[in-house]
Structure formats: structure tokens, C-alpha cells
Amino acid sequence: MIAYCAKNRIPVEASAKKPYSSDRNLLHISYEAGILEDPWMDAFAPANKAMFKLSVSPEDAPNKPEYVELEFRQGDCVAVNGKKLDPLGVMRTLNKLGGRHGVGRVDMVENRFVGMKSRGVYETPGGTILHFAHRQIESLTMDREVMHLRDSLVPKYAELVYYGFWFAPEIGRAHV
């Protein structure tokens, strides 16, 4: 496929040196296919260092921790280290902060909607920080039964979103 694209001057990021696809948005970058189809291939090996765009390898991260203070209002992060930010600014700031410390790398095999398995390697430094911080706040503010309900509903909600059922009746009921 890479040769076909090159021959027909179709611009793609995949190449002989980067034999995988990537998809990027504000929350994460996903890497799939190509060399990643081999489940025994170590995605985090030094030879694959160039694949990652948002984060350094934990081995290359500073040995000194960097502390971050997040401010939440009605469940949303509104400030990082005392600086008020819009959602875009929060994600950009946390992606940079987490990325320089090797936070947020994930290697997993997914079960797709059609039943096939697919390996994905992800970078989500800002998402990892926000998720962890929000869970800590929830542990302080939610009672046990509400947390149990959350833990039973969140996987189904996430599955519906993952499958593209954003406008399905189930999603509408979850928003009530």
C-alpha cells in the first residue's frame, strides 16, 4: 500500500521507516496496523522511539517529578497550576507536561464492533492526567453507591460512543 501511494503521489504518513498508521486528535494519538500487527513486537522498544509524537519514553523522562495542580469546576478542569484555561488550553498544557514525563502510553488489543481484534498503541498524556485527577476527586466527593453505579454505567456508555452510537436512544437516556 505504501508503494502504491508513493507511485500515485497520494500523501500518507506511513512509510518504509514508519510502517503503521496514525490518527490524531486533541485527546490522543493512536497507532495501528503494519508492524504493530505482530503481538510480540515491543512497541516501546528503543527502535520505535520515533513513532511517538506526544511523549518521551519513561526511560528518557526527567528523574525529578513535576507536580501539577488542577482546578475543577462542576467536573471540568478550568485551571492548571493556577492559570485559568479553556478546554483546549488545558489539554495542550497537560499533553506537554505529561508528555515530557512519559505519561500516557498504552499498548492494547481491542475487540472491534465487527468482532475482530486489533492492536492499538496510544499516547494520551493529558487524558491520563485528567482521568487520574478526576477519579481522585470522585473518591473524595462521591458516596459508595454512586461510585458503584458509575462503575456499572461507564463501560456501557463508553462502548456506545466507541461504536459510533452517539445519537442512539440509549445515549439519550444516559444524558437524562
Where would I find each of the regions flagged by the language model?
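Nucleotide-activated chemistry modules centered on ATP-dependent adenylation/adenylyltransferase
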Residues: 1-175
